[in-house]
Amino acid sequence: MEVLNADEATRKYSDILSVEKLQELIDMSDVLARHSVEEYQMIVRNVLDAAFRRDAFQILRKCEALCLDRSKEDIEQEIYAAIDDVMTEYSSTNEIPQYKDVIDKCWSEVLSRQQNGYAGIPFKFPTLNEYATIEPGELFIFAAEAKQGKSMMLLNCAVDLLKKDMAVLYLDSELNTRLFTARIIAHLTGIEYKRLTTGNYSEEEATKIEEQIAWLKTRKFTHIYIPMFDQQSIYTAVKKVQHTQGLDVLIVDYFKGSGDGDAFDSYQELGRFVDMVKNKICGDMGICGIGAAQATVNGKVADSAKIGRNASTIAMIQDKTPEEIEMDGEECGNKKLRVVLNRNGAQMASGEYISLFFDGNRVLYEEAKQHTPQTPF
């Protein structure tokens, strides 16, 4: 305060800034500070983006004035030069290495992902692994209509990964942690969900419950209930878990817009969210991504353009029709899984699918006996 009072130019600030206000700023600084390079880079990108938008807007206004000035001739070059200057100034492209300088590193990464005949971590469904696996930097999405077992599929994947000693973060917009706990214990014990939640189980089953709770305590697993996803909270949660507990796989249940605003805004928001998970989290951090998305009654992924643009693989979960169950046989299960988009392997034709067995009471998915495709005459 003495320094501020010593100069006429700064004296007015001594009346505004009290010791208490300065202390408040100091206390807040720790909360506002960024504690990792990635978080700092994210803020820098936001600042540069705002600066680029400001300068681009100002240049475009000048270009607009040129277009309205009939005395100006041959304005194309002037407009091109003005826009090019802005694009060059804010270009984020660093030195671009030649392919010969990166091929050895890339091939080493390919080799590092090879294990037990698969690239990456296999799913619990052997036939699905012939099409795609769980890989760092990739985002695998299960799609299904509402209330058709998307969340239960993700839970099954999570447990299978925990059995493989993977570190898993499960971000849930559907179930709070209490309800999720009931589901995962029903899955692990094989006790029907209704009996488990109402206490209608035997002493032997109670022992099984305690055993599975004890096992879960040994796993590297975090479940976070976030009713409404937003990019900053998701990114912060992932970084915190990665730093404090380690993280191999991120599971997102599920990808959807906030529903606020008009349909276009929600659509754009969803696109940015999926892009952030695929590129900023899975890509930049080297984390495997699994998620779920809503499908329409016609078997299409809702907002498919935005999701499909970023997803590595999309697999559709559907009920088998009574005719399909009769034709395939009951031993071939009651669900079908179709790989409808795949950047890491083959896709299925319209009549192809993987046969699964689904028991909603026990929160269980298993691969069933695979059906023999039949050609109708």
Which residue ranges define each predicted feature?
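The Walker A/P-loop phosphate-binding site
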Residues: 92-191
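Substrate-engagement module of ASCE P-loop NTPases
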Residues: 269-295, 307-313
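Helical hairpin unit composed of two closely spaced alpha helices linked by a short loop
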Residues: 247-279
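Cytosolic-facing regulatory segments adjacent to core modules
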Residues: 129, 165-246, 260, 352-355
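Interdomain "pre-motor" coupling segment immediately N-terminal to P-loop NTPase/helicase cores
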Residues: 33-101
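Structural motif
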Residues: 141, 223, 248-253, 290
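Noncatalytic partner-interaction/assembly domains of nucleic-acid and motor enzyme complexes
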Residues: 1-50
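C-terminal regions of RecA-like/P-loop NTPase motor modules
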Residues: 231-250, 264, 283-284, 297-377
